């Protein structure tokens, strides 16, 4: 009867399809306790040791850091990394990392000082006094990630679970051959693991907590049972040994009987899974206040003389760990990071240990066997029988090889856990997992490109829609403006139309002239006065510079006005007559001399004191001469062609003009002119008028006799002498 009740109390477990039973090879390393490894002289800490983006750097080259000090900031899925020991940051540069191709990733390189000093640690021994959010934030900021191999940020995983989680599963199966890191951790630190499990349960509040462990770990099972002897909140489930029972989906099915849907997660069925190493890291982060700076790593293989499990600081070079374990490499020695089924071969040994590194396998040549040649698939279906995910590996192989991405996706290649069971049983030695990894990478690249194209298309369509809206709005504005013009535009149009109509009305009105009456020119007079006023205003606004600088000379103004009137009359007469008469050289010479004298006088007056007082007598004489010249030009314009030029007279007049010019230049620099005598001025004006009349009479008399060049030259010389003598006599008289 007792045996019957014991059978009813036995916890039920389930099984999954497929799976294999490879040699375990765990006894090489699980028999010795955990031990510390001497500090390496230099540490390389990659910024990205988890799923997601790398954190933001918060240190610089040359900074001194302590163990546990944050090197990056963690926001969202960006998980921070911490210094594994105290030392100095000597570089922040790309460095080869734990990857099949040893890809270079940005890393912080620290030179250890050997002191291994910690930051100030603050633990929460009473973690129940803190809120769920505070605990999750602490776990995240202390860099805790999944240590079972995935490297998913634990804080993000706990935050995403929320209230949907009904079952918390602790994965202690550790099913892959050679790896004993979790086994040794459970043997040496069972109490700390259980305390970390209780912290996770406090955060999630599930209905049940299950620990799944394979039956090939008797020492670990006994230690956990001893710790859980009086506990009723955690159940320990021992499961049969079969690879890969440690897979998340496979262990969930074994312990709960539920299957995770295709393309889904275990949280979709109310299950959340954590590794025993992660539970231990949670305890150290929350209770002890220690960020994750080290983890347990299995050093095993026949090429290692002292296999076992060690506490390896993150960032320690693989070469340093293997040398500490007595590594004896052969000619073609390989080193595998991870297990023999899911691990990968390292191109060289300078890569650092990261959070997902659980094993370093250094097998001998006889241990792993010689590599065999890949052969063609014989469609034996052994791979399909061994697949724990119920897939068809042979079909996925053909799809991957033929680049048939759609068919590979339709056959759920994303559900492949890359356990390597298919490749283990394949008689043709086909590396199926390598094909599947490459195919999934290509599909991810295609999806990423499609996502970028969709985003670009969405941006383009949004831009086109915006341009169409702007165009429609612009057309609407133009249409409304055409239909309803603005008030000021209407006023301007109306005013313009009124002006046009007024001009048309004025043009069409007949001109009525009454006999015996004067025409009404008031409108014309008003328009002329308006134009004059406008001209005066414009002249006042823009005065002539020379007029503003020096005062006007009435005498010069009178002479220039008379000359201008004469020229105007002459031009009016010439406009309707025959072509202009020949130029009189004598007159041209006289006018040129007078112009030069005036120019010299004006230049001297511009730089000297203000102009001297105007002499009315000289002004009257020059005005009379100008009027006489004007009358003479008028008569010549309407009469016969000009008489022949008399060179003698021209020379005499030129000499007289030059003498007058010299006299004017001398008078410019002398004392102010003497007071003007009105009587003398009147006499000189009368004499000038008489001379002008005489010249007019001579103009209409007999034509001038032909000019004799010799006589003209003699007369010109006599005239020059007389002009000089007259100028000197004038100067003496004035003195």
UniProtKB/Swiss-Prot annotation:
Residues 534-716 are annotated as: Disordered. Binds 2 [4Fe-4S] clusters per subunit. InterPro entries: 4Fe4S_Fe-S-bd, 4Fe4S_Fe_S_CS, Ion_transpt_RnfC/RsxC, Nuo51_FMN-bd, Nuo51_FMN-bd_sf, RnfC_N, Soluble_ligand-bd. It is found in: Cell inner membrane. One of its GO terms (biological process) is electron transport chain. It is an enzyme of class 7 (translocase). Residues 368-397, 407-436 form the 4Fe-4S ferredoxin-type domain. It is a peripheral membrane protein. SUPFAM superfamilies: alpha-helical ferredoxin (SSF46548), Nqo1 FMN-binding domain-like (SSF142019). GO terms for molecular function: 4 iron, 4 sulfur cluster binding; electron transfer activity; metal ion binding. [4Fe-4S] cluster 2 binds at residues 387, 416, 419, 422. This is Ion-translocating oxidoreductase complex subunit C. One of its GO terms (cellular component) is plasma membrane. Its EC number is 7.-.-.-. Its main location: membrane. Keywords: 4Fe-4S, Cell inner membrane, Cell membrane, Electron transport, Iron, Iron-sulfur, Membrane, Metal-binding, Repeat, Translocase, Transport. Belongs to the 4Fe4S bacterial-type ferredoxin family. RnfC subfamily. The complex is composed of six subunits: RsxA, RsxB, RsxC, RsxD, RsxE and RsxG.
């Amino acid at each position: 009867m007792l045996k019957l009740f014991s059978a009813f109390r036995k916890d039920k477990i389930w099984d999954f399809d497929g799976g294999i039973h490879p040699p375990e090879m765990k006894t090489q390393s699980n028999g010795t306790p955990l031990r510390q490894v001497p500090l390496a002289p230099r540490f390389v800490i990659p910024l990205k040791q988890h799923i997601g983006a790398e954190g933001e750097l918060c240190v610089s080259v040359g900074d001194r850091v302590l163990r546990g000090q944050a090197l990056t900031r963690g926001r969202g899925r960006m998980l921070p990394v911490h210094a594994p020991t105290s030392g100095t940051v000597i570089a922040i540069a790309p460095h080869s990392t734990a990857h099949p191709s040893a890809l270079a990733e940005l890393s912080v390189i620290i030179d250890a000082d050997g002191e291994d000093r910690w930051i100030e640690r603050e633990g929460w021994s009473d973690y129940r006094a803190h809120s769920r959010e505070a605990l999750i934030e602490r776990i995240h900021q202390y860099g805790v990630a999944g240590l079972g191999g995935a490297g998913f940020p634990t804080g993000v995983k706990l935050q995403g679970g929320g209230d949907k989680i009904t079952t918390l599963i602790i994965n202690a199966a550790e099913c892959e051959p050679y790896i004993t890191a979790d086994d040794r951790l459970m043997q040496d630190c069972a109490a700390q693991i259980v305390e970390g499990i209780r912290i996770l349960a406090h955060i999630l509040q599930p209905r049940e907590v299950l620990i799944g462990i394979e039956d090939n770990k008797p020492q670990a099972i006994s230690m956990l049972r001893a710790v859980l002897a009086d506990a009723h909140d955690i159940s320990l489930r021992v499961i049969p040994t079969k690879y890969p029972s440690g897979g998340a989906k496979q262990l969930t099915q074994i312990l709960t009987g539920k299957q995770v849907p295709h393309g889904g997660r275990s949280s979709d069925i109310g299950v959340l899974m954590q590794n025993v190493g992660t539970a231990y890291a949670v305890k150290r982060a929350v209770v002890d206040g220690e960020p994750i700076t080290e983890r347990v790593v299995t050093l095993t293989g026949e090429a290692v003389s002292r296999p076992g499990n060690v506490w390896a600081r993150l960032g320690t070079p693989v070469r340093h760990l293997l040398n500490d374990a007595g590594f004896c490499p052969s000619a073609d020695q390989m080193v595998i990071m991870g297990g023999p089924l899911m691990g990968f071969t390292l191109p060289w040994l300078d890569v650092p240990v990261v959070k997902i590194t659980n094993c370093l396998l250094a097998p001998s040549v006889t241990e792993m066997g010689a590599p065999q040649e890949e052969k063609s698939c014989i469609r034996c279906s052994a791979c399909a029988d061994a697949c724990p995910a119920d897939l068809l590996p042979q079909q996925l192989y053909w799809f991957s090889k033929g680049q048939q991405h759609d068919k590979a996706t339709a056959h759920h290649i994303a559900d492949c856990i890359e356990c390597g069971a298919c490749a283990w049983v394949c008689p043709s030695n086909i590396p199926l997992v390598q094909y599947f990894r490459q195919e999934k990478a290509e599909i991810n690249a295609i999806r990423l490109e499609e996502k970028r194209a969709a985003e670009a298309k969405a941006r383009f369509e949004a831009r086109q829609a915006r341009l169409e809206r702007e165009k429609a709005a612009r057309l609407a504005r133009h249409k409304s403006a055409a239909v309803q013009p603005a008030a000021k535009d209407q006023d301007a149009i109306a005013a313009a139309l009124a002006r046009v109509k007024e001009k048309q009305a004025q043009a069409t009105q007949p001109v009525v002239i009454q006999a015996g009456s004067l025409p009404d020119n008031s409108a014309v007079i008003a328009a002329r006065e308006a134009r004059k006023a406008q001209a005066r205003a414009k002249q006042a606004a823009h005065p002539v510079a020379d007029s503003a600088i020096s005062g006007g000379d009435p005498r010069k103004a009178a002479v220039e006005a008379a000359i201008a009137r004469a020229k105007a009359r002459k031009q009016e007469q010439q406009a309707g007559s025959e072509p202009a008469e020949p130029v009189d050289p004598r007159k041209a010479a006289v006018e040129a001399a007078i112009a030069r004298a005036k120019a010299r006088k004006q230049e001297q007056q511009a730089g000297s004191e203000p102009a001297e007082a105007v002499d009315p007598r000289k002004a009257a004489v020059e005005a009379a001469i100008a009027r006489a010249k004007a009358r003479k030009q008028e008569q010549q314009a309407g009469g016969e062609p000009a008489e022949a030029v008399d060179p003698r007279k021209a020379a005499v007049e030129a000499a007289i003009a030059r003498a007058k010019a010299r006299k004017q230049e001398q008078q410019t620099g002398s004392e102010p002119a003497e007071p003007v005598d009105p009587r003398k001025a009147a006499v000189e004006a009368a004499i000038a008028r008489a001379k002008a009349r005489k010249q007019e009479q001579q103009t209409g008399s007999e034509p001038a006799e032909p000019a004799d060049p010799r006589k003209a030259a003699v007369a010109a010389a006599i005239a020059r002498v007389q002009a000089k003598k007259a100028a000197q006599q004038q100067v003496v008289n004035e003195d």
